[in-house]
Amino acid sequence: MPRSRINGNFIDQTFSIVANILLRVIPTTSGEKEAFTYYRDGMSAQSEGNYAEALQNYYEAMRLEIDPYDRSYILYNIGLIHTSNGEHTKALEYYFRALERNPFLPQAFNNMAVICHYRGEQAIQQGDSEIAEAWFDQAAEYWKQAIALTPGNYIEAHNWLKITRRFE
């Protein structure tokens, strides 16, 4: 039974109903419909913290999905799972892959910046200020890209850039 039929969450149920209607109305191939079903089930599993199941659904959606824009969101969600699991190197890889297909994902730039900032903080704790500065500089570059795509968002990042004199 597809996950969307067993999920008791009202919002997920509403999303599933709307998605099913759209799939019937919008002309799509059976492969596109199947890819979306796996993507939807992946999001449902991810929202419940069932990351292994979510990844299985996302990988299957990736196998079927041909549209680069849609693939970017699948890759982004895979990155989110790896971030949640503390697998930052893998997460960065998936965010990069998402941005290769869709360079207008400010949330991917933001998440990459957060990981780099975290690594900078770790380097400070280990007493390596030179490495920390390199990570902070990289975080700044990613935050600048996120802010450029969505001015007015990422206020804390914008303030950090100003305070650390990394904003131009």
Curated annotation (Swiss-Prot):
Q: How does it sit in the membrane?
A: Peripheral membrane protein
Q: Which UniProt keywords apply?
A: Chloroplast, Membrane, Photosynthesis, Plastid, Repeat, Thylakoid, TPR repeat
Show the Gene3D superfamilies listed in the entry: Tetratricopeptide repeat domain (1.25.40.10)
Q: Main localization of the protein?
A: plastid
Q: Which GO terms describe its cellular component?
A: chloroplast thylakoid membrane
**Would I find Thylakoid among this entry's keywords?**
yes
SUPFAM superfamilies assigned to the protein according to its UniProt record, in alphabetical order: TPR-like
Location of the protein in the cell? Plastid, Chloroplast thylakoid membrane
Q: Where are the TPR repeats?
A: 35-68, 72-105, 120-153
Q: Name one GO biological process term.
A: photosynthesis
Biological role? Essential for the assembly of the photosystem I (PSI) complex. May act as a chaperone-like factor to guide the assembly of the PSI subunits.
Please give the family membership noted in the entry.
Belongs to the Ycf3 family.
- What PANTHER family does this protein's entry cite? CELLULOSE SYNTHASE OPERON PROTEIN C, TPR REPEAT-CONTAINING PROTEIN MJ0263
HAMAP family to which the protein is assigned, alphabetical: Ycf3 (MF_00439)
What's the name of the protein? Photosystem I assembly protein Ycf3
| Organism of provenance | Atropa belladonna (Belladonna)
Lineage, top ranks: Eukaryota, Viridiplantae, Streptophyta, Embryophyta, Tracheophyta
